[in-house]
Amino acid sequence: MERIKKQLTELIGHTPLLELSRLGKAHQAQARIIAKLEYFNPGGSVKDRIALAMIEDAEERGILKPGAVIIEPTSGNTGVGLAWVAGVKGYKTILTMPETMSVERQNLLKAMGAKLVLTPGSKGMRGAIEKANELRDNTPGAVILQQFENPANPRTHIATTAQEIWEDTDGKVDVFIAGVGTGGTVSGVGEGLKQHNPHIEIIAVEPDSSAVLSGDKPGMHKIQGIGAGFIPKTYNPKVVDRVIRVADDDAIRTGRELSLKEGLLTGISAGAATFAALQVASQPEYAGKNIVVLLPDTGERYLSTALYAFEEYPL
């Protein structure tokens, strides 16, 4: 039987699950930690899912027309997804991004054909959003897909990511953990899983130094991709059972451990989510349970960051 795809978008999703047995053993985990490896998506991250979903939703609603320009504020991964999906579909992209994002991310976006506009790092994602709105107002035919507000974001995780996890664990999932950038992943997957079993615990992860979900003020942090500094409309607190705060150092060291113990080259936010999973898995009440943690992207986008500052963060 022929198995040839017609275009790259057909390869989005159906990413594998991997048990982190060596890492779990090293940390005396009493629960089973299972990673959802989202860097198996064509663009290298979970954000391919929402890029395709938001573009197709906008097409169906008549918002995106031939020759349109897509503008989007991004910390990197959504931009990569939008750039390549838009390219496949014939749209141009202009992306706004805090200047503090890794040089790998910046170069990757340019390589994908996007025009990149950097904003002050001190303003975080709010600064990127403000700049995107300004560019839209001055660019004929421009559309902002609004990943922080667009219901197509969590909706695609309900329909795809959650169902994949449920099916691939044969319904044996007790806890789901994910970092919060837009909040679409943890909210959508959480809602999708709870449709099958309302007792599944959903845990959100945020930077300790910018813990706005926990009621603190926004602040600077090193965990790129999560901790936008505000609570997005795509984050649904009713789905989330609790929030775990993770310090930069713990996220970075755990990210490095994933590489050394499991051979997984992942990003800093994957380290944060995995650190949270290890904390939960060490508690006696979770003994024998299955914890699924979503690892959003590949570490190749962070080689110039603190994640690989070996002298500053020795293991």
Which positions does each model-derived feature cover?
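PLP-dependent amino-acid enzyme catalytic core
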Residues: 1-315
